[in-house]
């Protein structure tokens, strides 16, 4: 199992030999510094603790600074544990952990939309737009919680109402790695990844085994990338 923390740069396109445009998301991966190693004997599970995104010392409190000094590392903004990853303290995990043609899972928070109404949040229909409608056009309407009978005099949990929309942790699975630019710390992934530009993305090697890329043009693109990288070596 391979894992990395990265930053979403944005989206672009890569072109196959036949001119087909393939949408790709660009992820910048600053080297993930290993801060600590958890073992099954001492901690009950195997994992490594990494730090990501270098910050100034004044941005952190003293307990966190002591943790970084113990690991002989620069202060980092984000600390994350990766289960079942083998590495030593002080090592750096880079984009070279992944290679073109590999499948990965991307986990990130979706774009936040703040407090929104039920039409945008739950795709409700609008009310009549005629002048005689009288009723506000974007109201929720009745939620059928009146008196008597089977109608409870309360609002059940989960009722679709206005509220906070977006900023939810979402995992997109089995995304194809199109290219890895180790000298620029960039990785190109086929398709879209949740979140706005500048958001933190967790990349993990996909658990799905035996998946075959069905698009022959993308297969040829990856084959050409592999042959060119071997020639450069």
From Swiss-Prot:
Keyword terms, alphabetized: Ribonucleoprotein, Ribosomal protein, RNA-binding, rRNA-binding
This protein's record includes keyword Mitochondrion: no
Superkingdom: Bacteria
One GO BP annotation of this record: translation
Gene Ontology CC entries for this record: cytosolic large ribosomal subunit
UniProt-listed Pfam families: Ribosomal_L3
Oligomeric and partner information: Part of the 50S ribosomal subunit. Forms a cluster with proteins L14 and L19.
Entry similarity comment: Belongs to the universal ribosomal protein uL3 family.
PANTHER family linked: 50S RIBOSOMAL PROTEIN L3, LARGE RIBOSOMAL SUBUNIT PROTEIN UL3C
Record protein name field: Large ribosomal subunit protein uL3
């Amino acid at each position: 199992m391979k894992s990395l923390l990265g930053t979403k740069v944005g989206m672009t396109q890569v072109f196959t030999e036949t001119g087909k445009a393939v949408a790709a998301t660009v992820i910048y991966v600053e080297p993930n510094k290993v801060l600590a190693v958890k073992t099954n004997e001492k901690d009950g599970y195997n994992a490594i603790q990494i730090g990501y995104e270098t910050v100034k010392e004044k941005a952190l409190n003293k307990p966190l600074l002591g943790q970084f000094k113990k690991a002989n590392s620069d202060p980092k903004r984000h600390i994350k544990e990766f289960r079942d990853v083998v590495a030593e303290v002080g090592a750096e995990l880079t984009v070279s952990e992944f290679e073109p043609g590999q499948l990965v899972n991307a986990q990130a928070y979706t774009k936040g939309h703040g407090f929104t109404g039920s039409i945008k949040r739950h795709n409700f229909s609008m009310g009549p737009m005629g002048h005689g409608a009288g009723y506000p056009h974007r109201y929720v309407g009745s939620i059928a919680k009146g008196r008597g009978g089977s109608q409870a005099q309360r609002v059940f949990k989960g009722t679709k109402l206005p509220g906070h929309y977006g900023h939810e942790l979402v995992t997109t699975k089995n995304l194809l790695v199109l290219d890895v630019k180790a000298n620029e710390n960039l990785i190109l992934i086929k398709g879209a990844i949740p979140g706005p530009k500048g958001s933190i993305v967790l990349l993990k090697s996909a658990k799905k085994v035996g998946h075959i890329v069905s698009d022959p043009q993308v297969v040829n693109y990856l084959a050409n990338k592999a042959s060119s990288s071997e020639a450069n070596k």
